[in-house]
């Protein structure tokens, strides 16, 4: 078993506390293999974390940068270029929910949408050019095995040579077997009127508040994963358009 720890971002007031805990509480022979670093927007954030790790008992911990903001995605090529010689990381994770909130996107695109895959295609193309592996964003429909495998086949068709790892949120789906003769998804353009966008935002707000696990957690409603990011984005959209 290999375990990775997601810490708070380097701009968070909890960042140092997280690192101190890892340094003092996790032994060198731990099953913890690496650290997920959220909201990476510059290579310096990775270098700083690498330096801190070098002072740990477990100095071999891997770093997995998480691309979750508009600036992070814009700087992805620069970040990858900067690591050409240093080799401080092998994997890059894309966080779709955080990215949509950061970029002011509404509605949040899903694997059914062309807009969702346009972002994934760009990231995978850059990772392929730099020989890095991809950690996929959580699949938002945890009960839809068919759509999950259609999405996987679509990814494999796009970039058959890129190593792709899947979110632990979807571990149950990843252990299933696809249906016979199931093909790749055929994503379509998301075209909604302002009225439809408002209606969707109202639905997300209502479903999130009625179904969340606790005050700081996500919700699952009608087989759909609703993170707090989506609720916040829906509220922001309604404040501007209603």
Segments and roles (model prediction):
Residues 1-242:
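Expand to "…catalyze enediolate/carbanion chemistry for C-C bond making/breaking, isomerization
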